[in-house]
């Protein structure tokens, strides 16, 4: 059958478009995709129903962490593939490019007061990765290495999706560290963040141990 012109495509409209893209635009897009660093807002309110699960927490969170930072999201076009491969691979020391990206993120972070120390969260999946990242940040940033915030032996497994039950499982999960002589902001490092409750509860442990109010969560990925 004979077709009729639709008037929309370049053949019908008589307009030809080139596939060429301005090199400056390509460079700008590539730079943006490869630039690490995203803000992670802290939790501001306790979940409803905490009293029903036996924890007397309600209202506004006053002892949580400050705004955190990650290299990127696992779904990102830029860093996403690299970070997924890193977290899916067997545990290993932090690769040079990931350490460099982390340092770049921290260098661009608007701190009122420079961090004085860095600490890693205990991990059952990436203890070597987190520990080596803490060591690298301590060396590059000349920060005090506080080691690892260790889990208690009797801690509950965190399996619930419900926020109240996640907080319940994380409550009293860590051994209170010795922060004697630490005066100033602390970087708290983990591999990945999802709900934000792990850092919220871990920050409370550091605050009870005498940490400065400015605890900066530092994740590899979200």
Protein language model regions, located:
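DG-centered beta-turn motif at the end of beta-strands
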Residues: 189-192, 196
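Active-site-facing substrate-recognition patch
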Residues: 19-117, 131, 135, 148-183
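C-terminal helicase lobe
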Residues: 1-23
């Amino acid at each position: 059958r004979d077709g009729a012109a639709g008037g929309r495509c370049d053949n019908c409209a008589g307009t030809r478009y080139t596939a060429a893209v301005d090199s400056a635009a390509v460079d700008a897009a590539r730079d943006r995709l490869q630039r690490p660093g995203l803000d992670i807002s802290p939790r501001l309110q306790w979940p409803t129903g905490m009293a029903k699960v036996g924890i007397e927490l309600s209202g506004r969170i006053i002892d949580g962490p400050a705004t955190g930072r990650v290299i990127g999201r696992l779904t990102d076009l830029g860093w996403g593939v690299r970070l997924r491969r890193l977290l899916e691979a067997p545990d290993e020391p932090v690769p040079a490019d990931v350490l460099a990206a982390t340092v770049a993120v921290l260098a661009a972070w608007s701190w009122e007061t420079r961090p004085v120390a860095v600490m890693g969260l205990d991990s059952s999946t990436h203890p070597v990765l987190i520990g080596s990242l803490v060591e690298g940040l301590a060396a590059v940033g000349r920060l005090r290495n506080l080691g690892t915030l260790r889990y208690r032996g009797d801690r509950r497994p965190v399996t619930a999706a419900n926020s109240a039950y996640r907080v319940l499982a994380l409550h009293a999960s860590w051994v209170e560290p010795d922060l004697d002589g630490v005066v100033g902001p602390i970087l708290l490092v983990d591999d990945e963040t999802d709900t934000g409750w792990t850092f919220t509860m871990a920050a409370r442990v550091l605050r009870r141990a005498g940490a400065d109010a400015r605890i900066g969560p530092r994740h590899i990925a979200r």
